[in-house]
């Protein structure tokens, strides 16, 4: 009985690992030039707020993928998904999750 339970949970863990490896994340995409320019602008901020500015730009890029109306600069930060979603955008885990929430 204990071996069966252990094997069952091991199989479930392997399935979860395989599923997470197959999903496409925003960090897996090549950074577009417009996003790199935004990061360069954030680099020019004063040292006390530089890291905060970079984190905001990075977070906005990820959050713009499923929601292009989030901030006015979404088309600059996430050109893969804004203003028109390209096929690669529909493969992103964050976009798939948002689409599931909208449907259900």
UniProtKB/Swiss-Prot annotation:
Q: Which UniProt keywords apply?
A: Disulfide bond, Secreted, Signal, Toxin
Q: What GO annotations for molecular function exist for this entry? A: toxin activity
- Extent of the signal sequence: 1-23
Where does it primarily localize?
Answer: secreted
Does the keyword Signal belong to this entry?
yes
The subcellular location is:
Secreted
Q: Tissue specificity, please?
A: Expressed by the venom gland.
Family (UniProt):
Belongs to the scoloptoxin-10 family.
Q: What is the protein name for this chain?
A: U-scoloptoxin(10)-Cw1a
